[in-house]
């Protein structure tokens, strides 16, 4: 199920998305003023934000921490009508849902972000395990 929120009576409905990210990608988002995702690398044909926070937490904690030493969870809003052009893919269980955005369309996708990209959680290893730092 895709949840949408409404910013105000006159604004368009938005879709809340989350993105697990490592330190390099987060630095590029910060450099954009927290307004845009950086271009994908040549071996990354798809940008895939996820549709629920729990899945983003699992990726940040279980994949990004071992790979990069830190994992972050970001949250952002996108115009819901615009987001419908991209397929939702189930990457595992029923709640493991990703929005698949082709890399060549990421600049346009960024133009439809509403507000700023927010850092909502960070995870770091503690005695061989990961722990939560964030809100």
What are these regions (language model features)?
Residues 2-48, 54-135:
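Conserved NAD+-utilizing ADP-ribose enzyme module
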């Amino acid at each position: 199920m895709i949840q949408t929120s409404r910013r105000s009576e006159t604004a368009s409905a938005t879709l809340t998305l989350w993105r697990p990210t490592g330190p390099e990608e987060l630095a590029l988002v910060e450099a954009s003023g927290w307004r845009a995702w950086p271009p994908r690398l040549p071996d990354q044909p798809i940008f895939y934000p996820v549709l629920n926070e729990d899945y983003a937490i699992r990726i940040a904690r279980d994949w990004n921490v071992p790979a990069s030493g830190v994992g972050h969870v970001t949250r952002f809003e996108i115009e819901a009508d615009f987001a419908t052009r991209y397929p939702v893919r189930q990457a595992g269980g029923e709640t493991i849902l990703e929005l698949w955005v082709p890399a060549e369309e990421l600049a346009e996708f960024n133009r439809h972000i509403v507000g700023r990209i927010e850092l909502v959680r960070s995870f770091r290893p503690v005695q061989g395990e990961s722990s939560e730092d964030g809100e």
